[in-house]
Amino acid sequence: MKCVVYGSKSPVLHQALEEVKRKFLEEKILTDFDFMIISLNYKYPYENLHRDLVKIFDISSDAYFGFHSTETIEETEIHDGLAVCFIKFENRGRLKVYWDSGISDYMSNGLLQRLVEYLEENKNNLNVFFSAWEDKNLGLFIEDLGRILGQKGFYPNLVGGVSSGRKFNGELRTFQFYKGKVIKDGFGILTFENVEFTLGISLGFKPISPIYEVRKADNYKVYEVDSRVPFKRIVENFLTGLEKKIEYLWYCPIVLVEERRGIRKGAENL
């Protein structure tokens, strides 16, 4: 599998995509591609994304997947435009997309069971998960998913998270995009088949913060650290001078380390 990434800072969606196409054609690292993954700043008019992609790149409606982001990474540069990852598979490699909606009502609409069945069918493949933000049930949905997978005795190769975004024009834009569909209350999964991969934890930063000893916790929910200090107070300190919004914690890596087993997982639901 080969990939190249090109981006644009243009605030006009059509022009930004045209610039990305020009870079792709001029550099000629790839002569063609099989799939596109688009990181789209929340300020763009996403209603036009499908139309512009199909027209500019002459692709079928199922040859792309997009997601909202507050910032875009293009090589070593971070900006608030868009970026496109072009993928070209070799040999028998391929990618398929699974998406569903209804996280806000997942306990009664069968969403969780459908997802578990899909992950069980694809447990040997790499599954990259992109979810929209949902205020009430997203955390419970993820917890229930982990519980059911544990009961079934398997853990799929599942990585990913919630699309980053902000409130804009009256809506919190953390959506995904596929086949002309805007996924506002659900998720999309990119499943890579016949592709070699390995999973591990890369901190991606140099730890510089104090180290706390967890005194009270339930699974990955941390309640107290050090001398019975509520961990909630530590988290609130992270937000000093900012609004008390959980979105800001996306930029604040927290890692739990077990004395015997090493790094286990990034802390969640703190």
Curated annotation (Swiss-Prot):
Pfam families: FIST. It comes from the Bacteria. This is Uncharacterized protein aq_1453.
